[in-house]
């Protein structure tokens, strides 16, 4: 393997407090399905008063923010050719920039106009940060921004690219970083050692452009990585890349699947629920609903339902057990990002025009209860941490939070506590 060390253009340092809590560490949250537990106090009355802070970003990015303890991390790409790759760290409290690192891209930076080089979402194990760009540059930093290792994957795999841009986000399973570098030429998926960045495994993948991200699910009590492509979904062992099961009836190449327990909900001929067989056993097709067809947004799993948004901006709630559609509500689109939810009974989604919508999921039918207009283009998916939403637009990073309790409310809460 040939490692390529980038030129570090800026160096600062900040100590991470001991015991910092990692919460939203990857694309679509801790479970990779858009939902998170324990955030009951997220704002439901979205308005300008909900904006806790807004900070400018030096370049475009489609990747979501990730949150580790009290820090928010985003990637960006700037310059006329988007060849300046950047990682930025902000305080979640006030949006203060804590550090930024800049690197020169070693791979191709050509992209379709709507997307950009900083399309993948970074991932963290709570100790280090791993960032991948469309240029196939893979960088590992510690949480102080110190460089640990880099891989210029184009140096090792020179034909691994497509003219539209890459967007698949890496994930971490155990001590392995899994990434899909799928395209119409040198297409592959690989597992990288977290500490060194060296290949643990590499497998060939279908030669076709693909923007989906890997998903983890349990299969027979064992964690399996699901790799989605136009051919279907392949389940592999995260440590070795060896095949465990294969669903070969096709799937989408834009919205990714979502898992809950041992069940995978895949955008495949509409929406398909699968229970893969353990140890290479037969995969069970639980149900398929051709009329429930996700568009760009990936399915969201929250409670006993799976939520999808179709190409006309209609949000549907589906019973996870049997695929029955329970209700539909029309949202203001268009959408490129995916919905997220917490256990406060509400769903959040931002459209391409910068309008954030909060949907109450607690009733017999969903209803939009509030909106916020940020006035900037948003192609990304929001993240959740504590009692706040974090969303990046083309030019800014935003924190959306509820209003702090009044003095009287705080005193009443204190008096009612045991």
How would you name each of these model-derived features?
Residues 7-16:
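Bacterial N-terminal signal peptides
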Residues 1-7:
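Bacterial N-terminal signal peptides that target proteins for export
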Residues 18-418:
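Noncatalytic, solvent-exposed loop/strand surfaces
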């Amino acid at each position: 393997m040939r490692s390529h060390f980038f030129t570090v253009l800026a160096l600062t340092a900040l100590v991470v407090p001991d015991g910092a809590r990692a919460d939203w560490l990857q694309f679509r949250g801790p479970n990779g399905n858009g939902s998170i537990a324990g955030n009951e106090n997220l704002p439901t009355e979205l308005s300008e008063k909900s904006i806790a802070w807004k900070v400018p970003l030096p370049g475009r990015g489609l990747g979501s923010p990730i949150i580790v303890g009290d820090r928010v991390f985003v990637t960006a790409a700037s310059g006329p050719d988007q060849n300046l790759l950047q990682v930025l760290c902000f305080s979640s409290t006030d949006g203060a920039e804590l550090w930024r690192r800049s690197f020169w891209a070693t791979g191709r930076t050509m992209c379709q106009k709507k997307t950009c080089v900083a399309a993948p979402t970074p991932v963290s194990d709570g100790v280090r940060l791993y960032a991948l760009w469309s240029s196939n540059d893979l960088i590992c930093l510690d949480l102080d921004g110190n460089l640990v290792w880099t891989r210029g994957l184009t140096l090792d795999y020179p034909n691994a690219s497509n003219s539209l841009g890459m967007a698949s986000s890496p994930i971490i399973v155990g001590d392995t970083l899994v990434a899909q570098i799928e395209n119409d030429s040198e297409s592959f998926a690989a597992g990288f050692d977290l500490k060194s960045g060296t290949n643990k495994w590499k497998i060939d993948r279908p030669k076709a452009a693909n923007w989906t991200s890997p998903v983890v699910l349990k299969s027979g009590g064992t964690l399996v990585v699901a790799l989605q492509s136009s051919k279907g979904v392949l389940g592999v062992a995260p440590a070795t890349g060896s095949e465990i099961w294969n669903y070969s009836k096709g799937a989408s190449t834009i919205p990714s699947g979502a898992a809950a327990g041992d069940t995978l909900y895949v955008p495949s001929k509409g929406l398909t629920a699968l229970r893969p067989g353990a140890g290479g056993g037969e995969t069970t097709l639980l149900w398929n609903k051709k009329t429930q067809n996700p568009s760009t947004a990936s399915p969201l799993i929250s409670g006993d339902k799976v939520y999808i948004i179709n190409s006309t901006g209609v949000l549907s709630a589906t019973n996870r057990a049997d695929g029955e559609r329970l209700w539909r509500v029309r949202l203001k689109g268009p959408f490129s990002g995916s919905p997220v939810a917490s256990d406060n009974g509400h769903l959040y989604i931002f459209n391409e025009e910068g309008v954030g919508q909060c949907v109450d999921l607690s009733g017999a039918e969903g209803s939009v209860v509030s909106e916020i207009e940020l006035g900037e283009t948003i192609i990304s998916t929001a993240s959740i941490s504590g009692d706040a939403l974090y969303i990046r637009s083309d030019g800014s990073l935003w924190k959306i939070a509820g209003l702090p309790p009044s003095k009287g409310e705080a005193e009443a809460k204190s008096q009612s506590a045991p």
